[in-house]
C-alpha cells in the first residue's frame, strides 16, 4: 500500500473516515483500488468464528456473537468421523446436553440408541414424548430381552449394494460366538474347556428348536415370514445339566439366571426393538450385573448398526466411567473401542459422555479413555475442576484461553 497525505483536504478526509456516508469524490478517485474479499476481510476490525453447518442440529449459541451453532457431524467433507465426546464435572450439564442432542437427532429422522448406566429415568419422559422405546434392564423388570434370540435382519440394502457377492455367515454360529462372551462375563475364570462345553450345549439347544447352521432353518414352516420360536436360558441350562460334570460349574452359575434372583432374563423378548429411539436403562443393575445389561444392549445394537450402511444412526453411552470399572472393564472397554473405531463404516456416530475423569482414565493407564477422546472428531468440554482441566488441556492441546473457560 502506498500512503498519500491529504494536504489541504484533512477535513474532507476526516469526514470520510467517520460513519457518515460522506464521500469526497476527489479523495475517492485517488484512494480507490481493486481488492480481493479475502484481503478486504483482513482490515475489518470485527472478527468472530462461526460454526453453522448445513443440515446440522442446534448445539447452542456462540458466546462471542450470540449466533446459533449448528453442527452436522455426519458431513464427511468437514469431519473425519461423526463421533462426539462430552466431558464435564457433576452438574455441568452433560446428561442434559446428551438428551437434547438425541431428541434433535430423532427429530431429523436419525435412528437413536442409548445405553444409560446411571439415572436412566431422566430420559423416560423424552422417550415417551418421541414415541420411543424405554427398556429397563434389571432383575424383576417388566421389560425382557431373550439373550438367545436370533433376530430377523433387513438385508435388503446389503443385497442391493453387494448382490450375491455379500459374505454369508451362519446366523446360529454368529449368535453362539456372541453368547460365549456372556459366559465369560458371568464366570470370569471360565476355562477354555468350559467354553467349548458351553458351545456344545448351545448347538444342542438350538437343534432342539430345529435351528441348524443353515440360515434357512431359522424360518418357521408353520408361520411363513417369521422365525421359529427361540430357546431361553432355561433350555440351555437343561442341556448343560445333561452334559454332566464337565458343565457343572457353568450350569451352577447360569442357574441364577434361570430360576434365581435374575430369572427375568429367562423370558421371551417383549419389547419393540424396531423403534426409531431406544433407550436402555441400566440404573437398577448392581456393579456385578451391569456388564450383563451392557452385553444385552450392545449385542442388539451392534446387530442393527451393521444391518444397513446407508441409514444414519447414533449410539450414545452416558456415564462411560461406570462402564470402565469392575471385573468386566476389559470386555466392555474393548467393545466400546470396536464401536468407536468402526461405526463410521456403517454410517453411524458414537456419542460418549463422562464425568469422574479419574475413573475414565484410570483403567489400563487411560488406554481406553484416551482412545475414546482421540477417536471423536467433535468434543464438548464443560466445567472441570483444576486437576481435570489441566489434564484435558494437556491431552487436547488447548490454548490458555480455552483452558480458562473450562475451569469451574
What annotation goes with each model-predicted range?
Residues 1-13, 17:
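Conserved ASCE P-loop ATPase motor domains encompassing nucleic-acid-directed helicases/translocases
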Residues 4, 67, 74-92, 96-104, ...:
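Conserved P-loop NTPase motor cores
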Residues 198, 404-407:
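Amphipathic alpha-helical segments of the small helical/lid subdomains adjacent to P-loop NTPase cores
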Residues 13-69, 119-120, 124-132, 137-141, ...:
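P-loop NTPase motor domains
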